[in-house]
Amino acid sequence: MSEMTARFSEIVGNANLLTGDAIPEDYAHDEELTGPPQKPAYAAKPATPEEVAQLLKAASENGVPVTARGSGCGLSGAARPVEGGLLISFDRMNKVLEVDTANQVAVVQPGVALTDLDAATADTGLRYTVYPGELSSSVGGNVGTNAGGMRAVKYGVARHNVLGLQAVLPTGEIIRTGGRMAKVSTGYDLTQLIIGSEGTLALVTEVIVKLHPRLDHNASVLAPFADFDQVMAAVPKILASGLAPDILEYIDNTSMAALISTQNLELGIPDQIRDSCEAYLLVALENRIADRLFEDIQTVGEMLMELGAVDAYVLEGGSARKLIEAREKAFWAAKALGADDIIDTVVPRASMPKFLSTARGLAAAADGAAVGCGHAGDGNVHMAIACKDPEKKKKLMTDIFALAMELGGAISGEHGVGRAKTGYFLELEDPVKISLMRRIKQSFDPAGILNPGVVFGDT
């Protein structure tokens, strides 16, 4: 047994430290499509913040790189370990510690899956609303990537729904940031700095999340449009109406066809309409009162028809849920039809038509294709890229990311930089900002052990 194996085992116990062939293959990767799997030298499963602190202190003193893992649902490679490194799995730190209805918060450990948090709050009339599409994803992963998802148009992303953290620094020191309140104006906001840092600054061991009223009545309207510009012209009208949709998604015709064929969707849309439309707008509403929901759905349908929709299909209950669940799998449907990479750029909402039309043109010029869907309400584009020539694909991705930034957007809206996008980030982002980020990283992690290679590409 090596010295480090013995030290890590002493901290978490022999049963909770894995090495060699005992490390599961799943621990070698997340859901990033292009990065090669890499097993760590050690995989530890701590049960307490104190054990995490001891692991980090030992790793820091011995120069062992550390990668944190929640559910492994990330799409950018931030949970892919480093050769010779330590993977810290939060499988055992998976408890909802408290549901505080008076303050409308829950206190949870980082390994809690969204499904378990939803179950824990089901009888309270409250819920955690961040909905990144993978309900098996962990709250810690949500924090690490600043996850968003379909409900961000109404409820915001993770940083809008996290009020406080407990985190462990690479030195083994444990800090608390924020609290069970919306206001803190005392020094720098370390909560927000750690959110979205992809495990490069500190490891989160406890999260205080905001809970919102649980609205039990839900319905959706799906509207096909002949022209994508009409879809995007309808979005600000819907948002300005006061109806407050919790989901507002566009789906292009190619992606919808893939969803229908791979997910066995029955939407009742005639073939001639499906063949003639360019894109769809999905509007989901929720309410405590069924009659009010019905009135709002009727209003949305009428608005969409006035704004140029070919038709408006009301989906309730199981049919609405099935479409939303299928939308969550949109990229995997596109992948089944030949896509080999994904981007999640974000641009100002009004720039989406220009971004999408230009990106498709760039893809066609590279003998490829760019199709997809996205969060029309917040400008986050999920585009599946098909381009078989590796050099052409790399240039295409660079050009699309550059286009997003030229339009005032960013390379990633919710998946993060991870390992997959470091080259694009370093090439296209403001070097002054990158330098400042490096200094922040150095301040938190002077030994450079936390997720080396993530964000900055340094290993």
From Swiss-Prot:
Matches recorded under InterPro entries: FAD-bd_oxidored_4_C, FAD-bd_PCMH, FAD-bd_PCMH-like_sf, FAD-bd_PCMH_sub2, FAD-linked_Oxase-like_C, FAD-linked_OxidoTrans_Type4, Oxid_FAD_bind_N, Vanillyl_alc_oxidase_C-sub2
Top EC category: oxidoreductase
EC number of the protein: 1.-.-.-
An example Gene Ontology CC term for this record: peptidoglycan-based cell wall
FAD-binding PCMH-type domain location: 35-214
Gene Ontology terms for molecular function: FAD binding; oxidoreductase activity
UniProt cofactor(s): FAD
Record's keyword terms, sorted: FAD, Flavoprotein, Isopeptide bond, Oxidoreductase, Ubl conjugation
Top-level taxon of origin: Bacteria
Stored Pfam families: FAD-oxidase_C, FAD_binding_4
Record location of the Isoglutamyl lysine isopeptide (Lys-Gln) (interchain with Q-Cter in protein Pup) cross-link: 354
Keyword ATP-binding among UniProt keywords: no
Region spans: Disordered: 28-47
SUPFAM superfamilies xref list: FAD-binding/transporter-associated domain-like, FAD-linked oxidases, C-terminal domain
Protein name, UniProt field: Uncharacterized FAD-linked oxidoreductase Rv2280
Organism: Mycobacterium tuberculosis (strain ATCC 25618 / H37Rv)
